[in-house]
Amino acid sequence: MYIQILGSAAGGGFPQWNCNCVNCAGFRDGSLRAQARTQSSIALSDDGVNWVLCNASPDIRAQLQGFAPMQPGRALRDTGISAIVLMDSQIDHTTGLLSLREGCPHQVWCTDMVHEDLSTGFPLFEMLKHWNGGLNWNRIELQGSFVIPACPNLRFTPFPLRSAAPPYSPHRFDPHPGDNIGLLVEDTRTGGKLFYAPGLGKVDEALAEKMRDADCLLVDGTMWDDDEMQRRGVGTRTGREMGHLAQNGPGGMLDVLEGFPEQRKVLIHINNTNPILDEDSPERAELVRRNVEVAFDGMSIEL
C-alpha cells in the first residue's frame, strides 16, 4: 500500500493566512525552523497509479500539482484520482471538491450523516450536479468493510469516532455515529494495515484494539495542550470541545501512543498553534524521544 501525505495541517494550514501567533510569525520572519503545511488530506493506492483521495482539502490543487502521480498524462484530460473518501463533512475536508468540478463525475464514499450534511447545510452534492453529473454517492456503512473497485487490493474498514459535526450540520449539537469516522485500511496482498484517524477525540478499548491491529497509526495531532488556543490568545475553545485529543497531559495522545510500541506512529492534522511545528522546540524533542513522527506535506509511507 502506498500512502502519500498531501496535506498535514489542520484547518487554515501553516502558517495560517490571518494568524500572527508565535509559530506563524516566526515562520514568516525566519526565526522558526519549520515547514509550511497545507490542510489535511492523504492519498492511498495499491499500484501507484490509481489513487483514493481521503478528504478533499481547500488546498487540493496545489497538493495535486506537488505529487506527480496525480497527473499520469494518459489522455487529454486525466487524473490519478479514482475515488474520494470523506471522513467527515468539515469545510477543511470537503471544500476541495469544488476545485475538482472539472473532473466530474467523481465516485465519493461517505456515511449517511456526511451525505446529509453535504446535501443540506453545505450542499456540495446539489451544487456539483451541474458539472457532468457531479458526485456519485457510495454509502459507507458503519458495520463491515468495503472495497473500492479502482484499488481492489485495499480493504477499508470504517469505524465511528467521537467528534463534533460542523456548525452547518442539522445535528451540530446532537452527535450521531458517522458524523466522523476513522479507517483501518489493509493491503490484502502485503498484509500491511493503516489506522487513519485525523480527528480523534477519545480512544476507548474498542478503538485501541483496532490500533493494535495496524502497522502504522496516522492519528490526530491537532494540539499539544487542550487549552492551547486560549494560551496562544487566538481562541476560546479547548481541543476536546472541538473533538481533538491533545498530545500532552494525563490520558493525552502521547500517553495513548505509549501503549503501541510495535507500531509506526505519525501525527497529522497539526494546528498552526502547536509547538511541535517548531523543529527546535522541547515538545518536538519529546516526540523524538517517544519515537513519534510528525507528518509533513510530501511524506510517503509504504506498507
UniProtKB/Swiss-Prot annotation:
Keywords assigned by UniProt, alphabetized: PQQ biosynthesis, Transport
Entry keyword annotation includes Transit peptide: no
GO biological process: pyrroloquinoline quinone biosynthetic process
Pathway given in the UniProt record: Cofactor biosynthesis; pyrroloquinoline quinone biosynthesis
Gene3D superfamilies per the UniProt record, alphabetical: Ribonuclease Z/Hydroxyacylglutathione hydrolase-like
Keyword Lipoprotein attached: no
Purpose: May be involved in the transport of PQQ or its precursor to the periplasm.
HAMAP family: PQQ_syn_PqqB
Protein name: Coenzyme PQQ synthesis protein B
